[in-house]
């Protein structure tokens, strides 16, 4: 039951679509432009760096909020499996972001919300993923490649830290934690399936922080 409640809490938080709201401020639907989703990269490309930064922050914070709420609700009674419950909240939030019922299930791809998840779940993993992301970004400028690579790193580190006993759970719950993280990782790759095809074909769009670097 606790898992379902965490999923619902996360899903409700995930329904707050920062990019979509910014689009409405500009009197347009962000999903009608660029990649057709309501995420950070599309906001950056469609409305500029400021809008992209606001979208990143908003989508990141909603996942942090979902995890904070779950920790407040279950921090005392379910402390033994709290890391697992926080991942269920994150899963719900990313599902709400990617497939919002309020927007006919047309949301984003979940990367910014996943940043919030990693920050709130394990800051050490966040630091490693951030280094991996930016090292690859300044080399390739492919946001999709960087995001998926960072996700893969996060998944591997969860496996490593879980095996080391960092999360303080028994084996059954630790394996369940791995499964939830695997679902999150698989969903990220699925949502980026078109990007993956373009990467293989060499047609994926690059993102530059400065117009001076564009070719």
Task: Please name every model-derived segment.
Residues 1-5, 67-87, 119-126, 160-179:
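Helix-coil boundary and interhelical linker segments in multi-pass alpha-helical membrane proteins
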Residues 20-51, 107, 197-215:
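Cytosolic, membrane-interface loops and tails of multi-pass inner-membrane proteins
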Residues 44-49, 70-74, 110-140, 153-162:
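Interfacial segments of multi-pass membrane proteins
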Residues 168-171, 175-215:
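C-terminal membrane-associated helical module and adjoining short loops/tails
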């Amino acid at each position: 039951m606790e898992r379902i409640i965490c999923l619902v809490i996360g899903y409700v938080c995930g329904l707050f679509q920062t990019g979509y709201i910014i689009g409405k401020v500009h009197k347009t639907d962000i999903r009608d432009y660029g990649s057709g989703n309501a995420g950070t990269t599309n906001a950056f490309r469609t409305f500029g760096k400021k809008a992209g930064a606001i979208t990143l922050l908003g989508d990141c914070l909603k996942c942090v909020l979902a995890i904070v709420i779950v920790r407040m609700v279950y921090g005392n009674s379910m402390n033994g499996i709290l890391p697992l419950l926080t991942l269920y909240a994150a899963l719900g939030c990313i599902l709400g972001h990617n497939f919002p019922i309020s927007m006919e299930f047309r949301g984003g791809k979940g990367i910014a919300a996943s940043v919030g998840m990693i920050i709130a779940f394990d800051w050490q993993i966040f630091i490693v993923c951030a280094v991996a992301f930016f090292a690859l970004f300044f080399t390739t400028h492919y946001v999709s490649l960087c995001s998926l690579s960072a996700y893969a790193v996060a998944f591997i580190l969860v496996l490593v830290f879980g095996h080391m006993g960092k999360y303080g759970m028994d084996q059954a719950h630790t394996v369940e934690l791995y499964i939830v993280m695997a679902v999150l990782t698989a969903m990220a790759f699925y949502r980026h399936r078109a990007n993956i095809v373009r990467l293989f074909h060499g047609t994926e769009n690059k993102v530059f922080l400065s117009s001076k670097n564009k070719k």
